[in-house]
Amino acid sequence: MLSTMQDVPLTVSRILTHGATVHGDAQVITWTGEAEPHRRTFAEIGRRAAQLAHALHDELGVATDERVGTLMWNNSEHMEAYLGIPSMGAVLHTLNLRLPPEQLAWIVNHAEDRVVLVNGTLIPLLAPLLPHLPKVAHVVVVGPGDRAPLAGAHARVHDYEELLAGRPEHYDWPEIDEREAAALCYTSGTTGEPKGVLYSHRSLYVHSLQVNTAEAFALAAGDVALPVVPMFHVNAWGLPHASFMAGASLLMPDRFLQPAPLAEMIETVRPTIGAAVPTIWQGLLAELDARKRDVACLRTVVIGGSACPPALMRGFEERHGIRVVHAWGMTETSPLGCVSHPPAGVSGEEQWAYRATQGRFPASVEARLIGPAGEELPWDGAAAGELEVRGPWIAGAYYGGAQGEALRPEDKFSPDGWLRTGDVGTITPDGYLTLTDRAKDVIKSGGEWISSVELENHLMAHPGVAEAAVVAVPDEKWGERPLAVVVLADGATPGYEELRAFLGEQVARWQLPERWTAVPSVPKTSVGKFDKKVLRRQYADGELDVTLLR
């Protein structure tokens, strides 16, 4: 028997229309580095999104399902594209500006982007790629920047504001099947070519609902959200859509992602919640420790992308009164997989054991742990296996190209359709996930597993260590052993023996690294994670000055 409920499609245009009308006075605030940030109300964003849709459709001929690329920072114009492009029936394709040029060109060509919106400050990045992007017919420049490098390009160059000027501020948004594609984001491609994840209107909508729940980020009207995580990375973790839905204003940092301007914009604009990878927050914490700022407005910072060192969580809370919330997700999970809030009634030191985990899964995300023989493991907090997930905002395949079939590689999807995350961890009986490592980063030493993440977190708790990465390197006797790569804090001079002794207070002796090296900075991927494949290559090529301790 079918229900008597209405079947209304859950689409991005509904988020746009709702935010622009019900929450029309909320603002998208773009930091400019000048005395006053740039402000646009949600109502203005709605009108300009309609103008953008008219420009793309009427002037540039963008059709249904066509991918439109954006090479942009987090700013109000990017928000207009976020909402306007999917609402008109096209597909928003955010381009990761931190990818190597050859990968960026591959992605644009694979998606067959014909129109690319680019911030003027990013023209030096796009211009050299254009000769390798034969299908790009239109480049729309957003904001100031030297356009000379675009002279002579095969693509027509347009000015964003001129393109929008005089166009209708209302667009008759089409009724779209909620299962249709709304946005496209490619993984960072640390192994092989990047893989495209196509988000549906429905997945973005229900993901936004989840982001706004109390068990996630609890956004509401009156909040100001600061997505430091880029809009080109997994939809800025869903904050733009969720904020527009809830009526929470948005503080967009544009290109000002360094610790000092972040601290200044927090003190000036007063956001209530922020989201970024650990390396961003580590820099901000050091800035706040060095120079006192009024950041009492910031009740929560969300940390994801890689494991959050407990020392970072305690530093924010104990020295600045800012609560850190640990979360886990990936491009394929939209990205909200789980968020770490302690159970009700838990306080004091007991809560830290829960907050250090990746958290619990919401009702819409199912999870299981799979052992080395393919068996499902119990949720007992001890059995470690590869995490697999499924749910309404979890990818079931990768984009195979405009004429290609969806891709379901066996190493990424199980025979029964679950996403194989590549993360190894445990789950407690009450559902708290603790990730011990990436499957490819676990150090397999003498038949035992050593967690690189655990060693890194303990090392970064030492006051003389700013960053630490641990990777597996070949060992004749044990197969693999850990190599500790550290970045020393400014002015700190701890020796390797001291760091090893400090680590020895936290882990078993057989887990302690014998090989140590100090570097100016740990190489990072395009989304701010430690790039361990680079460290392994540097070690193999003899590029690291390694000290051997016995």
Language model regions located:
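Structural core segment of the AMP-binding/adenylate-forming
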Residues: 87-165, 176, 277
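Conserved AMP-binding/adenylation subdomain of ANL enzymes
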Residues: 205-224, 234-272, 287-288
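Gly/Ser/Thr-rich phosphate-binding loop
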Residues: 245, 271-276, 286-353, 366, ...
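AMP-binding/adenylate-forming catalytic core of the ANL superfamily
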Residues: 99, 105, 116-120, 391, ...
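Conserved ANL (AMP-binding/adenylate-forming) active-site segment centered on the GW(Y/F)…HTG consensus within
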Residues: 321, 351-355, 393-422, 439-440, ...
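Conserved AMP-binding/adenylate-forming core of the ANL superfamily
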Residues: 28-75, 79-83, 100-108, 159-162
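Conserved adenylate-forming
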Residues: 59-63, 167-179, 184-226, 238, ...
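Conserved beta-loop-beta connector loops within the AMP-binding
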Residues: 364-389, 429-430, 492-496, 531
